[in-house]
């Protein structure tokens, strides 16, 4: 797997969960002898929703809600076979979305 690169993108709503998952991935990759670049924090996406509280009148009565999507990027340079095998066996938290691309 020479001259390869594995790019891992993580997304989660909870920043503690995504930091824990990135730490597990980085520790696993370093333990198997691969070079790791990152974790690189990407911009947090904030979605805001405004909802009217009253059913009929009082347009001034509103609630605002926010969902934050935290993102991290990890590059694994020159991964070995052991690295790929260990990453495939890694059990991450349920609230973390993982996208892996080879390049």
From Swiss-Prot:
Presence of keyword Magnesium: no
InterPro entries, A to Z: Ribosomal_uS10 (IPR001848), Ribosomal_uS10_CS (IPR018268), Ribosomal_uS10_dom (IPR027486), Ribosomal_uS10_dom_sf (IPR036838)
Keyword Ribonucleoprotein among record annotations: yes
Gene3D superfamilies noted in UniProt: Ribosomal protein S10 domain
Stretches of the chain forming a coiled coil according to its record: none
A matching Pfam family: Ribosomal_S10
Molecular function (Gene Ontology), one example: structural constituent of ribosome
Key words of the record: Ribonucleoprotein, Ribosomal protein
GO BP annotations listed: translation
Domain of life: Bacteria
GO CC terms of this entry: ribonucleoprotein complex; ribosome
Family from the record: Belongs to the universal ribosomal protein uS10 family.
Assembly mode: Part of the 30S ribosomal subunit.
Described function: Involved in the binding of tRNA to the ribosomes.
Protein name (Swiss-Prot/TrEMBL): Small ribosomal subunit protein uS10
Species whose genome carries this gene: Buchnera aphidicola subsp. Schizaphis graminum (strain Sg)
């Amino acid at each position: 797997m020479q001259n390869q690169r594995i790019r891992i993108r993580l997304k989660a709503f909870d920043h503690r969960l995504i930091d824990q998952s990135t730490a597990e991935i980085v520790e696993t990759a370093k333990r198997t002898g691969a070079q790791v670049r990152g974790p690189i924090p990407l911009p947090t996406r904030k979605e805001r929703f405004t909802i009217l509280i009253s059913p009929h009148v009082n347009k001034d009565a509103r609630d605002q809600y926010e969902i934050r999507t935290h993102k991290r990027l990890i590059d694994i340079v020159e991964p070995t076979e052991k690295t790929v095998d260990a990453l495939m066996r890694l059990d991450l938290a349920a609230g973390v979305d993982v996208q892996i691309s080879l390049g």
